Amino acid sequence: NSVLPGPTRTDGVEKFIQDVFPGLTQAEAECRFIAENRPTSLIGRLIDPREIGDIVAFVCSARASVINGSCIRAEGGLVRTIC
């Protein structure tokens, strides 16, 4: 199994966004980044790393034993598909 995270709030992503939008607060820069670069995002924000961790923990647990060979998108609704 694999987890495919979308834009996640990490130190590197925060620095990148601040470099792209200098002079704005971190919150303002993140909002602008999402609005300009991820306008289709259903959650409209960066993903918290703990949210990705929760998914990974579940996929690694015995409760997910029937999930095999899956790619799990955790990207906040950027990709719109119906399986």
Enumerate the language-model features and the residues they cover.
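Conserved SDR Rossmann-fold cofactor-binding beta-strand/turn motif
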Residues: 1-9, 60, 73-75
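A conserved structural motif in NAD(P)-dependent oxidoreductases
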Residues: 25-26, 40-52, 63
